[in-house]
């Protein structure tokens, strides 16, 4: 045992970290991946990680932390629902939520004072605000991470307080305040290590894709874990044409499975054997990615980071209502760098068909897109971020 300068008694070699952030998978899973990378890095040094996750009760972060065996502490928080007209934000729901923030800040200060972390790491989302402010008030080093190309509102506020701001894309640096920019580092967006171990043969076996024609390319269609009606509609409207060009694995989401299956049931047997419909792709995802020659997806921060790191050619259809149109910014960033094709605005089945045809008919175009994606991808992002956090904690 040893005593730190602040009076906290700690096991020799133990690093104390408070992780905060949540609300969506885009914040939660990079945080979890980073915690795992921290544990691995410290284990190699014969040291240990003492970590607590501070988030909102009943949200995704509480469930994920519990499943990973990470201690979880809830604090009150509120969400600011944005509107094009600033007056539109003066709603009772916004006012009620924002009134919870001071209480959340007091809770967070109490947690930081009691735990005396070596470093606090924020991954965005509104719950990260009170905890990060508490770190600043208690003079604990704060590291924040931005997953999106366009700087999120929470991190825009916190960047001035952070000892280090880490971002996923060089394009984000110019959006930071001047002083924060000098303390910023591009590390990429941490993605799950298991995604890099995919095997096409395992996907065929696990999903029983015995009818797939291996002479055809494979297209993976996904709207994320919940599915996306817009993408489902675009694909099913032209499904017979698509199945003449490719095998298709289609993750449509639980709420859409019945409707999409009705469309699939109308396919001729020779086309239907090239089509695999699922409401969710779980543990098979690394293998599905390995099998896919082309991915059709949304453009959330996690998705584009995975596609880039894996070097997967993609057609991106952003969620128009994403906060601050961040998905459109993400998609445009990859498109401008030749790493994906972005379909923006009102997308029609004809638009999607043209984009698919160009990439399926021209293997060289897919190869070049994959190469461009890998150039943007940072597969060691979790390790880079973990190393920075440990340097900050010293």
Residue positions per predicted region:
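Conserved nucleotide-sugar phosphate-binding/catalytic loop shared by glycosyltransferases and other
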Residues: 17-22, 43, 47-100, 187-189, ...
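Donor-nucleotide binding loops and adjacent catalytic segments primarily
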Residues: 48, 64, 83, 200-295, ...
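Glycosyltransferases and closely related glycan-assembly transferases
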Residues: 107-120, 127-143, 156-164
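C-terminal alpha-helical cap of glycosyltransferases
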Residues: 378-394
């Amino acid at each position: 045992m040893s005593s730190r300068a602040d009076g906290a008694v700690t096991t020799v070699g133990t690093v104390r970290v408070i992780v905060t952030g949540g609300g969506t998978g885009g914040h939660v899973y990079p945080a979890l991946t980073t915690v795992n990378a921290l544990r691995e890095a410290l284990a190699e040094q014969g040291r240990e990680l003492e970590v607590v996750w501070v988030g909102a009760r009943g949200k995704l972060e509480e469930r994920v932390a519990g499943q990973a065996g990470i201690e979880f502490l809830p604090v009150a928080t509120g969400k600011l629902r944005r509107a094009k007209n600033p007056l539109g934000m003066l709603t009772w729901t916004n006012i009620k939520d924002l009134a919870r923030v001071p209480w959340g800040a007091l809770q967070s200060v109490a947690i930081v004072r009691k735990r005396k972390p070596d470093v606090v790491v924020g991954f965005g989302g509104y719950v990260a605000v009170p905890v990060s402010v508490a770190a600043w008030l208690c003079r604990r080093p704060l590291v924040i991470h931005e997953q999106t190309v366009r700087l999120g509102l929470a991190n825009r506020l916190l960047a001035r307080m952070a000892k280090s701001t880490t971002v996923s894309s060089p394009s984000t640096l110019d959006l930071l305040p001047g002083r924060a920019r000098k303390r910023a580092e591009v590390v990429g967006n941490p993605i799950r290590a298991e995604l890099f171990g995919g095997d096409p043969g395992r996907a065929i076996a696990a999903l029983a894709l015995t009818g797939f024609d291996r002479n055809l390319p494979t297209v993976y269609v996904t709207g994320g874990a919940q599915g996306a009606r817009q993408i489902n509609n675009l694909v099913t409207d032209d499904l017979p044409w698509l199945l003449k060009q490719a095998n298709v694995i289609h993750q449509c989401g639980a709420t859409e499975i019945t409707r999409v299956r009705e469309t699939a049931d109308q396919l001729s047997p020779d086309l239907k054997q090239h089509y695999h419909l699922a409401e969710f792709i779980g543990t098979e995802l690394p293998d599905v990615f390995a099998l896919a020659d082309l991915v059709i997806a949304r453009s959330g921060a996690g998705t584009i980071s995975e596609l880039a790191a894996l070097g997967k050619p993609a057609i991106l259809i952003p969620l128009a209502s994403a906060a601050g149109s961040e998905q459109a910014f993400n998609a445009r960033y990859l498109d401008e760098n030749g790493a994906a094709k972005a379909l923006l605005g009102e997308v029609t089945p004809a638009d999607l068909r043209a984009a698919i045809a160009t990439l399926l008919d021209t293997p060289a175009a897919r190869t070049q897109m994959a190469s461009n994606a890998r150039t943007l991808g940072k597969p060691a992002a979790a390790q880079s971020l973990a190393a920075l956090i440990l340097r900050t904690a010293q």
